[in-house]
Amino acid sequence: MEQPFGSWGWGRSQLGRVAMACALAAGALVGSGAGGLTTAAADPADIAEPAVVRPPDVPTESAPPQPDHLAAARHLKQHKNATPVGTNDFGCRPTAAHPRPVVLAHGTDSTAYSDWSAIGPQLVAAGFCVFALNYGGAPGADTYGTEDLRVSAYQIGQFVDLVLDSTGAAEVDLVGFSQGANVTRYYTNKLGGAAKVDKWIGVASPTYGGVMYGLVPVAQVIPGALDVFAKVTSTAAVQQAQGSPIMLELNAGGDTVPGVRYVTIGSRVDEMIQPFSNIALRGAGAENLVVQDLCPDNLTGHFHMVYDPFVQELVLRALDPEHAPMPTCEPVALGTGIPQVIIAGNS
């Protein structure tokens, strides 16, 4: 297996809504009293194989790179159909140097443009055919990644088939941010996608779920608490809680499958996925990169990952270890990007 980082010498989405959800859920917990214990949280949408899956939305209005989530959100207000410039060009044909199209999957309560406005054009400039979908949206919604993860995984499969049919390629490389990592891995591992996927890259991947600022362990033993959280966030947000049925299902029998090359890119100071060790895959051959192990002074967290230049370069190098330059290590302050995400989520 390629190990593009083994020789190195160096030792998002809508936070405002999540913060509101945490406050409301905490209030519900306080008001509920002792209640009683339950053995496991119910999955909000427990469907093993959906009878009908709406096709994913494919944005087509080319839009410029942005420096952060806030700038992307402001552009989206006037351009709902925005896609990162150069992406979703269905006339693109892979080259010998880059034979596989790259499919980008955004995170929770987000869009292709919100999360990939910077990385998408970088990959296009590097010579890749790049495609980005909007998946997991409720009918009529202008944000995505909120619905059942299993249904979203089927949408990923539909989009991969569209990309392969259009480009003539045999396989794709998948790059998922946050929830996007989970739904692309569900497609790869559980829906037969491995036959069509060469590389899977998870950026800030909630591989084993998160504790949502410490609320999850408490909420899982108080009846109704997760229902409160789901109502003020989304089905998808609750499904990504540590120990949820779908997290257990996704990782049952091993978190990787043969024939696919896996890379995770995580941060020790991820605001949403704690313990941060929940990001790493445990399957044989998976490569788990931690930003601070490679660049100790870079304290980027969950919400800034896709707009951090170092992480962007890690993604490019994971996709193209033979040609991509070595990432440049620069200090990044703790909490970078969070104010922009809060403003974007409440404006």
Regions found by a protein language model. Name each.
Residues 109, 137-139, 207:
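Alpha/beta-hydrolase active-site loop signature
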Residues 122-140:
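Conserved alpha/beta-hydrolase
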Residues 2-121, 330-337, 342-347:
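Flexible, membrane-associating and regulatory peripheral segments of lipid-active enzymes
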Residues 237-273:
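The feature captures the conserved acid-bearing segment of alpha/beta-hydrolase catalytic domains
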Residues 105-106, 130, 150-251:
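Serine-dependent carboxylesterase/thioesterase catalytic core
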Residues 94-98, 124-125, 166-167, 175, ...:
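Extracellular/periplasmic catalytic domains that process cell-envelope and extracellular macromolecules
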Residues 258-347:
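C-terminal catalytic-base region of ester-bond hydrolases, centering on the histidine
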Residues 114, 134-147:
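Glycine-rich "HGGG/HGxG" loop immediately N-terminal to the catalytic nucleophile
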